[in-house]
Curated annotation (Swiss-Prot):
Pathway: Cofactor biosynthesis; biotin biosynthesis; biotin from 7,8-diaminononanoate: step 2/2. Keywords: 2Fe-2S, 4Fe-4S, Biotin biosynthesis, Iron, Iron-sulfur, Metal-binding, S-adenosyl-L-methionine, Transferase. The gene is bioB. [2Fe-2S] cluster binds at C110, C142, C202, R274. Catalyzes the conversion of dethiobiotin (DTB) to biotin by the insertion of a sulfur atom into dethiobiotin via a radical-based mechanism. The keyword Calcium does not apply. It is an enzyme of class 2 (transferase). Its EC number is 2.8.1.6. [4Fe-4S] cluster binds at C66, C70, C73. This is Biotin synthase.
Amino acid sequence: MTLLNPNIPIRQEVKVRFDWSLEEIQEILEKPLFELLWEAQNVHRSVNPEYKVQLASLLSVKTGGCEEDCSYCSQSIYNSSDVTNQSDFDVKGVLEQAKAAKAAGADRFCMGWAWREIRDGKPFEAMLDMVRGVKELGLEACVTGGMLTNQQAARLAEVGLNAYNHNLDTSPEHYDKIISTRTYQDRLETLHRVRNAGITICCGGIIGMGETLKDRASLLRVLANMDPHPESVPINALVPVEGTPLENLSMVDPLEMVRMVATARILMPRSRVRLSAGREQLGKEAQILCLLAGADSIFYGDTLLTTSNPSIKADRELLASAGVSVNWDLYD
């Protein structure tokens, strides 16, 4: 079952642009909600007429002890959250988790290391073995491990890494209020190295960190003017964590997530727009609106690094209610 009604005409050609202005994007973000949803739907139907949704599972391989001072993150050594530092899993343990994710229906397995940059030596060799193993299971492999060198990117490409996640987090203008230990340019250069190695990038941001609407438009402008667009664009809602500088912020209005997803879909028609952190707080109805607005991937599994995520059972019910197309045969 899908939501697609064959009697509703859809636009067959979608123009892909890389020259969006800040004013254009802000105007899209501020459109009346129904008009914004209609425009995003028109694009989404054209590029994804079967409403296919990718299920991506995310495992924290190395948790805590990160030298970055990201204001939102429970894993930073500068914050006083109660996250327990966890040593690197061995390769076998990670691949067992990947097998379980595949058995539950995931088709992409993402692995995260709480590092400022990838560490050469035994940790990096283990990372390469994990990527090889995930690929041998028939899953797409994604890694997030901070900054990396050209040589490290090349070796990850050699073992078949599909995507490297390195988020921009927020706009260039708001960035210094959130992070001081890594520059925006550092992030852009990391993405450049990944692309030069032939690996696709997974790159998005977080809303609800005290930014303005103009900041959100500015973040989207950076992403939408990358040529080519990121393969995946994760859209996160801040989950305030006790012990972090942003612990007292309120959860973002769910309709702001809908707007962000819809605008990302319009700007980057062929990218995967991934509903990421904060889904549990959004609720079922807002998540379905996000799927309607153009989200075509979710992070799937009971935890998302160090924050909770909807249960697999809840997500199966959500996706069935929405009528989107998922490879359910992986389960049954």
